[in-house]
A protein has these predicted regions:
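Metal-dependent nuclease catalytic regions and adjoining charged, substrate-binding loops involved
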Residues: 1-6, 24, 48, 227-315
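C-terminal, charged and often intrinsically disordered regions of DNA end-processing helicases
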Residues: 1-89
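Anion-coordinating catalytic cores for phosphoryl-, nucleotidyl-, and glycosidic chemistry
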Residues: 42, 63-64, 186, 286-289
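A residue-level signal for conserved active-site and pocket-lining positions in enzyme catalytic cores
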Residues: 69, 93-94, 188, 221, ...
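Hydrophobic (often cysteine-bearing) scaffold residues that line and stabilize catalytic clefts
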Residues: 85, 89, 93, 142, ...
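Short, amphipathic alpha-helical segments that act as regulatory/interfacial helices
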Residues: 90, 94-101, 222
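A non-catalytic, helix-rich entry segment at domain boundaries
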Residues: 96-170, 175
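Mg2+/Mn2+-dependent nuclease catalytic core
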Residues: 168-261, 265
């Protein structure tokens, strides 16, 4: 039998951050899922008549956008979605990590990336169409950028054991009033609940540096997961691959109800901004660098001319 691989300090830190004894894992009252759902039901009910017959999809990205710059939010509303290297690299990298968990040979990052591209090209969705028609330059850039992320993940993380129940890009969905659909995909989840005792860890993998929205993203997922399962996750953890650094946050009832309130406030703001009843605000920041409204935004240009650094980004 082969000896287990020796772990480097970054990998040892991951184990230390994610590990917890059974006694250290909190327990939650089963009624919390019903109270959270009631909070959303009551908070979103005033908008039911306005949206009757329609479906409103609410994601972490939509909430993050409207809580930021309203001008950018409206500009992106008018943009037709199109796949690109920056949008596809995360999905490719996540698929490669998923394959690495079950790979029977030594995981070679670029081999995993190529297998992921091949597998996802066989689909019937928009990403598959783009992968089948992208240029050779785009494909080369995609391989390079996805490979960088997979290499860093395998360097910084210990091999994921089957008993940890690792799942990549786990889909979450919650429907309220048959109108509002809260949904998303968790980059990586580990562990499981034991009855009312929390045990699951939700992990978001990022490049770049910290942004406050990263905390809200995982809290949003924790809210949906709690209503789905009844037992909240134990821990939320944003992991910055470029830095080899964790930003962990323990899940509490207060955190979950705060997230529910943010969803209610966010939906109200989305509908208000889209009515165009008042001028949208402008909130210059690192995201101005890739904003579709930058050409006509003096505030954004001034911000970038000051040389502010870009914040962290999703995969």
């Amino acid at each position: 039998m082969d000896d287990p691989p020796e772990l480097n300090p970054a990998q040892q830190e991951v184990l230390a951050q994610l590990g917890a004894s059974r006694d250290d894992r909190p327990r939650f009252d089963a009624v919390i899922r019903h109270e959270l759902r009631r909070t959303l039901d009551e908070g979103l009910e005033p908008h039911v008549e306005e949206l009757a017959g329609d479906t409103m999809f609410v994601s972490k990205h939509l909430l993050g956008r409207v809580m930021g710059c309203e001008r950018r939010f409206l500009a992106e509303d008018d943009e037709e979605f199109a796949w690109s290297v920056p949008l596809a690299r995360g999905t490719i990298a996540h698929k490669a990590i998923e394959l690495s968990i079950h790979w029977r040979r030594e995981p070679e990052p670029l081999v995993l990336v190529d297998e992921s591209i091949s597998r996802l090209s066989e689909g019937v969705d928009g990403l598959a169409d783009w992968l089948q028609t992208c240029t050779e330059v785009e494909r080369a850039e995609l391989r390079a950028e996805a490979n960088d992320r997979v290499v860093k993940f395998l360097e910084c993380w210990p091999p994921l054991k089957a008993q940890w129940r690792p799942v990549t890009e786990s889909r979450l969905r919650l429907e309220i009033h048959d109108i509002f659909v809260l949904s998303g995909k968790v980059d990586l989840s580990l562990g499981q609940a034991e009855g009312d005792r929390a045990g699951k860890v939700l992990i978001d993998l990022k490049t770049g540096g910290f942004a406050p929205q990263h905390l809200d993203d995982l809290r949003f997922y924790a809210l949906i997961e709690t209503i789905r399962l009844g037992t909240p996750p134990r821990l939320l953890a944003t992991y910055y691959l470029d830095q080899g650094r964790f930003l962990p946050e323990e899940v509490t009832e207060a955190l979950l109800f705060s997230s529910a309130a943010r969803v209610v406030d966010g939906v109200a703001k989305i509908l208000d901004v889209r009515r165009h009843e008042s001028d949208p605000n402008t909130a210059p920041g690192p995201a101005c660098r890739w904003c579709v409204a930058l050409d006509d935004c003096d505030a954004g240009k001034r911000y970038l001319s000051d040389g502010d650094e870009a914040d962290g980004s999703d995969w």
